[in-house]
Amino acid sequence: MREIVHVQAGQCGNQIGSKFWEVISDEHGIDPTGSYHGDSDLQLERINCYFNEATGGRYVPRAILMDLEPGTMDSVRAGPFGQLFRPDNFVFGQTGAGNNWAKGHYTEGAELIDSVLDVVRKEAESCDALQGFQLTHSMGGGTGAGMGTLLISKVREEYPDRVMSTYSVIPSPKVSDTVVEPYNATLSVHQLVENADQCFTLDNEALYDICFRTLKLTTPTYGDLNHLVSAAICGTTCSLRFPGQLNCDLRKLAVNMVPFPRLHFFMIGFAPLTSRGSQQYRALTVPELTQQCFDSKNMMCAADPRHGRYLTCAVMFRGRMSTKEVDEQMLNVVNKNSSYFVEWIPNNVKASICDIPPKGLKMSTTFVGNTTAIQEVWKRVAEQFTSMFRRKAFLHWYTGEGMDEMEFTEAESNMNDLVSEYQQYQDATAEEEGEFDEDEELDDAMG
């Protein structure tokens, strides 16, 4: 079986992760004690993707929970599905990273990382055919950002040929959780660009907007936001877990979605987003779903896809539907909005269909898009970074942990390069192939 080992790091990662396990367990009919109470063999057919079967028929998640302070772990353990996880897979320190990337990456995190890697090895060894790893974390904190990226680079060394995908919560434009977010996020991107295969970006503000506007929740909590996120994560992995007419796995996704190795930051969307009360009153059709999932209001990341162009995108449908209809809709979207898709990648929309819909819905779609509009996010973070770094504000917290200013400068220029790469491909047309190659050769000669 094609297994995925799931790692959750830091407070944000653990909260998203534990919500994700609630949704996954529910889809597979696993109760909080790990026993199966489902109603269909399909739930068990590929359950190995995320679960290990232990003695007595208990199902245990292939999850590793790590943090530099015990607080979040305790609340996960006390949560509804806390008894599901293997007790040895909780790895935590006592000191906390205090929102300091350097603590997570170089000092506190580096002391804990070996015990995390031991657990990762143990989980990887119990797999038949390990497909890859997924990490949930935030980019603005200390543990998820600093130690999460440290773990990625260590895992990459040890399992170079496995897919590494991350679900990264990026800092929001208006709502800031910590002042040093721009530093932590820029240092994280610096790592993710090199060491991850695909990053699904999420941000709280876009999630709040969805809760307010679409779901009509007046006071959304983090629980509501995480529920949205877990719906999307489950959508990206449904083909691995259930049979379908047209399957899609992490590797296929990476191959189809990443035209250039550095440009692997995706936006995700989910449809149908309806408020909990009005769900059962309307059935959605494939055209409606398609239209909704391409809608910028459904994106879980505060960048507007209309401000850029799609390099590639993938749409995963769930439920019983005709493949012909799906193909027609995909074609329709591209033809109607051709200006939003780069013309030098023909057929850049990939569709996959999984027969089993999520709990409580007849059909749903998950959208993953690699759009140049995501540069808006990086631009915003880079501006905030520069305005603080110019004054060397808060730097002493990082240099005190042994970091060098040079590393900040490198991360900053890497971020700016990323933005200009996105811009370059956004402006590119199919005609200018010749000019492109010359530029590249010049760059190589100069670099």
Swiss-Prot record:
Disordered: region residues: 424-447
Chain sites annotated for binding GTP: Q11, E69, S138, G142, T143, G144, N204, N226
Pfam families documented for this protein: Tubulin, Tubulin_C
Keywords assigned: Cytoplasm, Cytoskeleton, GTP-binding, Magnesium, Metal-binding, Microtubule, Nucleotide-binding
Family: Belongs to the tubulin family.
Function: Tubulin is the major constituent of microtubules, a cylinder consisting of laterally associated linear protofilaments composed of alpha- and beta-tubulin heterodimers. Microtubules grow by the addition of GTP-tubulin dimers to the microtubule end, where a stabilizing cap forms. Below the cap, tubulin dimers are in GDP-bound state, owing to GTPase activity of alpha-tubulin.
Additional remark text: There are at least four genes coding for beta-tubulin in this organism.
The name this protein goes by in its record: Tubulin beta-5 chain
Species name: Ectocarpus variabilis (Brown alga)
Gene designation: TUBB5
